Amino acid sequence: MKPSYLFLDIDGVLNCYSDSEQLFLSEIEKKSNPSFKIYKSADFVCCNKLRLLQEIVTQTGCQVIGISSWFNSKRDQKDIGKFLDLKISGAVECTGGGTGRTKSIQKFLEQNEHSNFVVLDDQQVGHDVFGENHICPQREGLTKELQLKCIDLLKGELK
């Protein structure tokens, strides 16, 4: 059976502006905030968004491919996977934004057999080539509604 792929951006998907504002206020008040997981003292994810992502992977068996700047060549994919409690199967060549990211995803799909895929990325520019397979959290990051759409697409139940 051909694998399905979830192309994962992190910033804007597993965190968003309002999350960073809330985290910043917690840090100013020197309070820990269990709503967030901090990666190497600078980056973070929102725990409820991370749980939604983990459920997508569990329910679909998809392989996670990094497209975020978190996956640049200087960072260890296994370490990021451990932090997210997910297996990261790889990353595209260009983990910066813009058309380079889009072209890297297209190249990956051309070079790897697949049944279904989802591009989970808040970047709008260029990703229109993926049609319905581009799930674009706009302001709130990953939501339950977007999670269900990802699951349906990855299972081939939404075309």
Model-derived features: where do they sit?
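Classical N-terminal secretory signal peptides
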Residues: M1-S4, K159
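Flexible, charged surface loops at secondary-structure boundaries
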Residues: M1-K2, V57-T60, E110-E113, V129
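Alpha-helical substrate-recognition element adjacent to the catalytic core
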Residues: P3-G96
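C-terminal cap/substrate-recognition subdomain and adjoining C-terminal extension
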Residues: R75-K159
